[in-house]
Design a protein with these regions (language model features):
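Metal-dependent catalytic cores of enzymes that make or break cyclic nucleotides
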Residues: 1-172
Length: 172
């Protein structure tokens, strides 16, 4: 499922970047819980099979803040709250949340953004079929430097390559 895959890949990317062990754990947990705020979004919006209206987009864009409000008061999860809050920020500053730019976005949130996008692209959605890994990888490369941190994209591509070798040519 999305949360498990997100946590798995986020951990591998954080390790690939040689981040401290405690940070790796936080990033793994944040990746698993990044969409917890969707609990506060109407199901008909989440499951809608057609294009969202502007009003529905405004609603869906509240999920990182809702998630942060759920997670922040829980003492042992508090360190991951900013990662959840900022996982839809774009590297070039045009994402949503607070319009953070580049390194202003916590590295964990930048990792979650790449993993979340890749998993979303390679999974069936109510409004479209899953894209192939190859197409999703191309999309990540296209978004590198605008939507995504190029350093994170490169680390994730390395992780995917390692996973492919480990699994005899298949990406899990």
């Amino acid at each position: 499922e999305h949360a498990d895959r997100s946590g798995y890949y986020a951990k591998l990317v954080a390790e690939e970047l040689h981040l401290p062990k405690s940070m790796v754990k936080h990033i793994e947990y944040a990746a698993m819980m990044h969409d917890v705020g969707k609990i506060g979004i109407k199901e008909e919006i989440l499951l809608k099979a057609s294009k969202l209206t502007n009003a529905e987009m405004v609603e869906i864009r509240k999920h990182p803040l809702i998630g942060e409000k759920i997670i922040a008061p829980i003492e042992f999860l508090a360190p991951i709250a900013p990662l959840i809050l900022y996982h839809h920020e774009w590297f070039d500053g045009t994402g949503y949340g607070e319009g953070l730019l580049g390194e202003e976005i916590p590295i964990g949130a930048r990792i979650v953004a790449v993993i979340d996008s890749f998993d979303a692209m390679t999974s069936d959605r109510p409004y479209r079929k899953a894209l192939s890994c190859e197409i999703a990888i191309d999309e990540l490369k296209k978004g590198s430097g605008t939507q995504f941190d190029p350093k994170i994209v490169n680390a994730f591509l390395k992780v995917l390559e390692n996973e492919k070798k480990k699994n005899n040519g298949k990406t899990s």
